[in-house]
Amino acid sequence: MALKKEGPEFDHDDEVLLLEPGIMLDESSADEQPSPRATPKATTSFSSKQHKHIDYTRALDATQLYLNEIGFSPLLTPEEEVHFARLAQKGDPAGRKRMIESNLRLVVKIARRYVNRGLSLLDLIEEGNLGLIRAVEKFDPERGFRFSTYATWWIRQTIERAIMNQTRTIRLPIHVVKELNVYLRAARELTHKLDHEPSPEEIANLLEKPVAEVKRMLGLNERVTSVDVSLGPDSDKTLLDTLTDDRPTDPCELLQDDDLSESIDQWLTELTDKQREVVIRRFGLRGHESSTLEEVGQEIGLTRERVRQIQVEALKRLREILEKNGLSSDALFQ
């Protein structure tokens, strides 16, 4: 099948971020198309001098290198797009690869809209690329519309989902995330129209929703901080270390706990080595964590059933020790 090599035609919705190979990205030129007269020779000439202009210690280096690399992937004409989409639909790896590589700049264009939302640009691009791959897998070229229009929805969805999941401590169900995005989009729309941040009442009026429901949904967007987070890069203390325990502690209870611990240690000495080892590991004594029968067996080299038998023997022996000392075993073995 002969393919035309004419330049691609895009409508407004099909615009992509065009980046000439080897050209540095800045805010003023990021969305400009490359000159059709650019030649590999000019690119090579720039390459020989680029070390004078790029500071490789900057965090943007990786992003710039990625953008330069994807600039070598040519865009597809409408005819080529249909051709390679059909190949991808049939499971052809080459067709799938060409569809993905030719639309990587579309992902960058969309990802840049979500900068300063909690994820770096590279992370946003990575998530968007997952959406692009999904779009290639689901796209039907016989439907008659351009791939970029179809892929935009998948790319935006994966990016927005990643922002919601990765920037919050508590993850929300996906249906709640989708509903919350409706409220957040309404808030952004009102922010552009008004001279102030919209109130829940204004958002409720726009969406025709109850004010209480708007407040509830927006409350889900509040950041939650872990109490284990460090107070600073040079500090070993966490937020938990600065919180006071408001629960009253009875000194008598502390003494009773200490006495009980000493008594248990004494009683354990009257068990056999195997019995003592099983009880300590099963019930989390002497600094160990509680373990299952199978875990204890793996740790001491016995079968699960043998560990169970030793545990039964050990507990029976402990009850006898308690009764001999005039104590009830009920409280200890509840």
Swiss-Prot record:
Pfam families: Sigma70_r1_2, Sigma70_r2, Sigma70_r3, Sigma70_r4. Gene3D superfamilies: RNA Polymerase Primary Sigma Factor, Winged helix-like DNA-binding domain superfamily/Winged helix DNA-binding domain. InterPro entries: RNA_pol_sigma-70_dom, RNA_pol_sigma70, RNA_pol_sigma70_r1_2, RNA_pol_sigma70_r2, RNA_pol_sigma70_r3, RNA_pol_sigma70_r4, RNA_pol_sigma_r2, RNA_pol_sigma_r3/r4-like. It is found in: Cytoplasm. Residues 99-169 are annotated as: Sigma-70 factor domain-2. Residues 267-320 are annotated as: Sigma-70 factor domain-4. One of its GO terms (molecular function) is DNA binding. A motif (Interaction with polymerase core subunit RpoC) lies at residues 123-126. One of its GO terms (biological process) is regulation of response to salt stress. CDD domains: Sigma70_r4. Disulfide bonds: none annotated. Its main location: cytoplasm. Residues 179-254 are annotated as: Sigma-70 factor domain-3. Residues 293-312 bind DNA. The keyword rRNA-binding does not apply. Interacts with the RNA polymerase core enzyme. Sigma factors are initiation factors that promote the attachment of RNA polymerase to specific initiation sites and are then released. This sigma factor is the master transcriptional regulator of the stationary phase and the general stress response. Belongs to the sigma-70 factor family. RpoS subfamily. This is RNA polymerase sigma factor RpoS. It comes from Pseudomonas aeruginosa (strain ATCC 15692 / DSM 22644 / CIP 104116 / JCM 14847 / LMG 12228 / 1C / PRS 101 / PAO1). The lineage of its organism: Bacteria, Pseudomonadati, Pseudomonadota, Gammaproteobacteria, Pseudomonadales.
